[in-house]
Amino acid sequence: MSFESFGDFLAMGHHGPYVWSAYGISLLVLAINVAEPLLARRRYLQEEARRLRREAQQ
């Protein structure tokens, strides 16, 4: 499938809003799937460090 111009490419034969929003939502979900475990690990390590400091003080 070839397009006459970049504008035609973005419009995708009048399906552009659906196509680009689907790509955007997919990328958002992928980013969340990558970021969430990293953030959860960071929170877990911070909580464990806090717990170990409390136990060391007792």
UniProtKB/Swiss-Prot annotation:
A GO CC term?
plasma membrane
Compartments reported by the entry: Cell inner membrane
Residues annotated as transmembrane: 19-39
Query: Domain of life, per the record?
Result: Bacteria
What InterPro entries does the entry give?
Answer: Haem_export_protD_CcmD, Heme_exporter_D
Q: Which Pfam families does this chain map to? A: CcmD
- Under what name is this protein listed? Heme exporter protein D
Record organism: Pseudomonas aeruginosa (strain ATCC 15692 / DSM 22644 / CIP 104116 / JCM 14847 / LMG 12228 / 1C / PRS 101 / PAO1)
The taxonomic lineage of its organism, from the top, reads: Bacteria, Pseudomonadati, Pseudomonadota, Gammaproteobacteria, Pseudomonadales
This protein's encoding gene: ccmD
